[in-house]
Every structure is written in structure tokens, then in C-alpha cells.
Amino acid sequence: MAECLSQTDKGVVLSVHVQPRASRNELAGLQGESLKIRLTSPPVEGAANKLCREFLAKLLGVAKSRVTLVSGDKSRHKRLLIEGVTLDEVRNKLL
């Protein structure tokens, strides 16, 4: 799991692979060097990006405003910054 996480000055950057239009929102293990996340929303007009941020914020117990999309706006492969948390906190909550 360490491959998909990196510590920065602001928090932790998480690499994810998003599978939209799934039957439910869930973590689905690792895919390569990314955490795979299945989401119910379609990849239309940023709906999957929004749900991805909300889902991770809920899992990590942080405000939605502290989860920011860094890259991958139009891609299934995304990098998200979770502000104000440590690598160990994210690792413990997502495992």
C-alpha cells in the first residue's frame, strides 16, 4: 500500500484508480501502484470526482474540503491530496 501513498508538507497524496458505475462505493484493493475505488456515480460532469472526494473524506474522518484532486480530472487514475493527516493515519484507516 505504501506505493500509493506519499507524504508532503501539506498532507498525504493518495494515488487511486476509480471504477465508476459500480454497484456500491467501496475500496477494492490495489491495482498496480494505486488504490482501487469502486464508485456508483457515472464519470459525467465531475460526478465521480466529487463522489471520490466525499467517499475518501468519510473513510478518513476528515472534512470534504481537505480532500483535493491534484491530477486526473478526466482520467480513472487520480492523485488526491488529503490535508492535515499523516501517512500512518491514512494507512491505518484505509487498511
Curated annotation (Swiss-Prot):
Family listed: Belongs to the UPF0235 family.
InterPro entries attached to this UniProt entry: DUF167, YggU-like_sf
GO cellular component: cytoplasm
PANTHER family for the chain: UPF0235 PROTEIN C15ORF40
Classification via SUPFAM superfamilies: YggU-like
Identification of the protein by name: UPF0235 protein Pcar_0617
Highest taxon of the lineage: Bacteria
SMART domains: DUF167
Organism, scientific name: Syntrophotalea carbinolica (strain DSM 2380 / NBRC 103641 / GraBd1)
